[in-house]
Amino acid sequence: EVTVTLNGHNYSATTDAAGNWTLTVPVSDLAALGQANYTVSASATSAAGNTASSQANLLVDSGLPGVTINTVAGDDIINAAEAGAGQTISGQVTGAAAGDTVTVTLGGNTYTTTVQSNLSWSVTVPTADLQALGNGDLTITASVTNANGNTGSGSRDITIDANLPGLRVDTVAGDDIVNSIEHGQALVITGGSSGLNAGAVLTVTINSVAYSTTVQADGSWSVGIPAANVSAWPAGPLTVEVAGQSSAGNPVSVSHPFTVDLTAVAISINTVASDDVINAAEKGTDLTLSGSTSGIESGQTVTVTFGGKTYTASVAANGSWSVNVPAADLATLPDGAANVQASVSSASGNSASATHAYSVDASAPTLTINTIASDDILNAAEAGSPLTISGTSTAETGQTVTVTLNGATYSGNVQADGSWSVSVPPSALGALTTSNYTVSATVNDKAGNPGSASHNLAVDTTAPVLTINTVA
């Protein structure tokens, strides 16, 4: 057994045949850790009594970095001259370091930069990108991930008021990602315009297929993409291209990138309680449910349904996941067969689920010992022949019954009819003196639940004395 100590709490784990071990620290214990450096110590003692130990340092950094975005164009309103000159978007970060990457998104376009030594950052949005956005309200978002994997973000609302004719494409499929479910459905692409006449014809091109639509009185437009065409889109980056003419007859166009994510995702559930059977002892301690995923990003949420309750876990960097089921929840589980379900979705919305069967067997098997030697008394004649000790049990066929008499043990197996028996040889019976003995028997069912019984046996191997008085 391995004992692990973290923040004053001890946890136990058992090594497998290869010498590996693992354990789960409850969420409640992790939540109690402050942001600091901790020492994790582990020790183990072999069967021979030899002890080994090891330590590792653990940094807890659960604080999210912050990102701020400075005022854009002096007043968060980009006019015609400012749009024509391009704009620099800048800001500051906290909880991050120089060299960390800042990702900025504006109107479907993404720009990246690195944090400077004074924790500032900046990106340049070119004139062409600004003019393609057209007039209207927009939101700038910026995010940064620090060295410990914590991600923070910030946003800022701006307005483009440049009196520019232009077109805009709204977010595609809600997040600019078409997942495997959406890939099989019809899709509506929408957008807006300024400086175009109502009724102006627009050509929308996706994956080399052109669709025609018209501008509405409020400047909006939309086009429906049939499911057959959507399902023909290949995985990877695609672009919505929209082209038309302004009210002055000048050509206007816009491009909007999106992604088709058809990554196959999967989730699995490992064996429950090492053998898919929860016995009485296991029912009295916390249980770890675990499994693995593929095609799922680190940090995505796994939802587990077990015993009528729902638990959540996060996907680790290696695709694994685990949840802790408290003993209090296990205590309410009835005996019988059941299933555990787990489901997860990727960041793009592709989902997977799995079901795993297990059973609960927390009932101890019954065990009885029949009358021994027909009257529970072993006489001298019976002690000279093998003695059969027998009984019944509700343990499964083939389970081993261990019988102890006078310090010696004998083994038998449960038969199909529930009976069992062992034979005690005369050599062992001969060692019994005239006295009272206790015969004990034990058995474990396949789930590991123990059953036991005992029976009294009297040994009387002393021959009676017979005398004949003097005759006449």
Label every PLM stretch briefly.
Residues 75-85, 175-185, 275-285, 375-385, ...:
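Short, solvent-exposed loop/linker segments at the N-terminal edge
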Residues 12-16, 112-116, 212-216, 312-316, ...:
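Short, acidic Ser/Thr/Gly-rich low-complexity loop/linker segments typical of extracellular
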Residues 1, 89-93, 189-193, 289-293, ...:
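Aromatic/hydrophobic beta-strand junction motif of beta-rich domains
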Residues 27-37, 127-137, 227-237, 327-337, ...:
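Surface-exposed, short loops/turns at beta-strand junctions within beta-sandwich domains
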Residues 54-70, 154-170, 254-270, 354-370, ...:
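Flexible, low-complexity linkers/stalks enriched in Thr/Pro that connect modular domains
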Residues 19-23, 119-123, 219-223, 319-323, ...:
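Short strand-edge motifs at loop-to-beta-strand transitions and within beta-strands
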